[in-house]
Design a protein with these regions (language model features):
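Nuclease catalytic cores that cleave nucleic-acid phosphodiester bonds
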Residues: 1-21
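Intrinsically disordered, low-complexity Ser/Thr/Pro/Gly-rich regulatory segments
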Residues: 7, 21, 34-261
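Acidic, Ser/Thr-rich peripheral helices and adjacent loops at domain boundaries
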Residues: 24-32
């Protein structure tokens, strides 16, 4: 039986006279760390398959990194079109059925065709579109997830890079999680109870032994409110030695957030 000693940021053996356990001998999961600090993680967040690697995103990342701001706009338009498809993996969109329901249709269609061409060349989709319809298939569930929201691809890339960091041929981070939604009091109430909940989502959390690394990912610039959220959550659920990291595809070094970071 062990207990977590917040003052010492370590563990003590409750059976052996509170003897301190070496940090190297203790490895916590993200869920265990949050639970020890009084919170709980909401279930069902998507996690990439265990055998995924950064190479799986190489082509897609080329498209995103070339034009991060354009990517945000493209994904908003893509989702507007794809929301009208019965399947989200094998997309089929007859244009005659869409034209009357989407504003500025011609410009958006042109943008999407241009994007699909880029994704086709990078191996993200199999594009079979014609003049009458947009028709394409995502080449994996992981790649499909990365286009559901503009920021997903940066989160996934960060997570996969973390999984592959090694020290002496051993994974440096023992547990890696993304889209971690934390309930602050550890009690998940039924929505019908109408009890106010305090929750925050952290893009990526990596665990090295008992030390968590809280990461905020932004496909674009970072506002000061993101700095505040990251600091607050890490301080509450990470202990005194928690580490924090901001990752942004475009960071204005003159912005207040950049100066504070």
């Amino acid at each position: 039986i062990v207990k977590f000693d917040h003052a010492a940021n370590g563990f003590r053996d409750c059976i052996r006279d509170n003897a301190r356990i070496k940090a190297a001998d203790v490895h916590l999961t993200v869920e265990e760390m949050i639970a020890l600090c009084g919170g709980t993680i909401l279930p069902d967040a998507y996690q990439p398959p265990a055998d995924s690697s950064p190479r799986d995103l190489a082509g897609l990342w080329d498209v995103v990194s070339e034009a991060p701001r354009d990517w945000n706009r493209w994904i908003m338009q893509l989702r507007e079109f794809e929301s009208r498809s019965d399947s989200q993996m094998q997309v089929f969109l007859p244009l005659a059925h869409l034209r009357g329901g989407i504003s500025d249709f011609d410009r958006k269609e042109e943008n999407i065709r241009s994007l699909l061409d880029k994704l086709q060349r990078k191996g993200v989709v199999d594009d079979r579109s014609s003049a009458a319809a947009l028709e394409y298939t995502y080449n994996s569930r992981l790649l499909r997830f990365c286009t559901e929201k503009a920021g997903n691809v940066l989160e996934v890339k960060t997570l996969l890079e973390g999984r592959w960091v090694q020290q002496k041929d051993v994974p440096y981070f023992g547990d890696c999680q993304m889209s971690v939604s934390i309930d602050w009091d550890g009690i998940v109430h039924d929505p019908g109870e109408r009890i106010p909940e305090t929750r925050n989502e952290i893009d990526v959390i990596l665990m090295h032994g008992t030390v968590p690394l809280f990461i905020s990912c932004k496909n674009g610039n970072i506002g000061e409110e993101e700095l505040y959220k990251l600091h607050t959550v890490a301080e509450r659920f990470g202990g005194p030695y928690a580490k924090k990291m901001l990752i942004a595809t475009e960071l204005d070094r003159k912005s207040p957030a950049a100066n504070r970071a």
